[in-house]
Amino acid sequence: TGRQGFVYGFDIQQEALDRTRERFVRAGRSLDNVLLILDSHDRMTEHIAPKDHGAIAAVMFNLGYLPGADTSIITTAASTIPALDAALSLLRPRGIMTIVLYPGHEGGDVEASAVEAWASALPQADAQVLCYRLLNKHARAPYLLAIEKAQANEKG
């Protein structure tokens, strides 16, 4: 993020936030420019200052469940799709959003299909969408979507 950057991290599990904090500490990294928030990703706009709406450089989603924790606690399309809409509105022109999808776990395939449908329906004038998937792996292997928000003068 550099000296001027700021990171907001969201999760509904305190354990995930604690693990993140521990990783920063182990790496000798300061948490001065990091805010870890115990809340759902679909409420991100409520936690990000209005002055930063439309100015965020990057948003990253790592969907699914927390490895080594309760695998019944998963992300679902019900909160993920509104979170993606919110994230797109927060991005600055030419900002990037990445989404790692895990169709291999129970419920992951449903969420992945919904996210792909959402991304496929984005107007080209608003964003470009890239799918990065390993073709020589099983169909339920994790994969990445990357979305670049259009420059304001590229629209229309």
Predicted region positions:
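Conserved SAM-binding motif I beta-strand of class I
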Residues: 6-11
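Mobile active-site "lid"/loop adjacent to the S-adenosyl-L-methionine
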Residues: 57-82
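S-adenosyl-L-methionine
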Residues: 18-54
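A short helix-to-beta-strand connector/capping loop
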Residues: 5, 29-35, 125-127
